Amino acid sequence: MAVIIFVNGIRAVNGLVKSSINTANAFAEEGLDVHLINFVGNITGAEHLSPPFHLHPNVKTSSIIDLFNDIPENVSCRNIPFYSIHQQFFKAEYSAHYKHVLMKIESLLSEEDSIIFTHPLQLEMYRLANNNIKSKAKLIVQIHGNYMEEIHNYEILARNIDYVDYLQTVSDEMLEEMHSHFKIKKDKLVFIPNITYPISLEKKEADFFIKDNQDIDNAQKFKRISIVGSIQPRK
């Protein structure tokens, strides 16, 4: 059983990246074949594959632009347009090379495999590349962020929602929101909180009036980092 997690880079220090890495780690710890595939970056995209958090050594990482370069038709179609996105903070052009790679990935999957999409762009590209043919693998799209404010992401997800098997929220309050806004069956909605691990933070409490050679006690504190998405407008 293989789990593919499509990501828009794993270099940033934010909740989305940490959630993606922790999800990959959790599957790898269970002995599954896990592959993080990056969708952004130029040339090889390698600059977006330096994780700021611990990544399980068995998790494979690749950029989609650098996969299957041994297939002649993949190399020859790098200058043929396939997909473009022009959002305020996300602009990218994807050649037909990406289409061939996504088709190749689909051809290698079975009913026991899963794909997790962390951004609706990845979902739409996968659907278009495979000509709307239902994937053999289970398709899961995760909701990260505020989709009422990120209207472009909302629109992409809305037109591709029927292609996925499950829509995963990271907050149980979002289940009814998703059902209401996208009119999808409740059995396709899954609440799975972000997989998080405690981070040990050391805090030194010092008294500035004590002598320099006096021992200072160290207190250990633990903090959990996670994110909660919503499609509710912010107040």
Where would I find each of the regions flagged by the language model?
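N-terminal strand-loop element at the rim of the active site
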Residues: V7-V13, A26, L32-A92
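A short, basic/aromatic alpha-helical/loop segment that forms part
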Residues: V13-N14, P198, Q232-K235
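Nucleotide-sugar donor-binding and catalytic loop/hinge architecture
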Residues: M1-A2, K203-R224
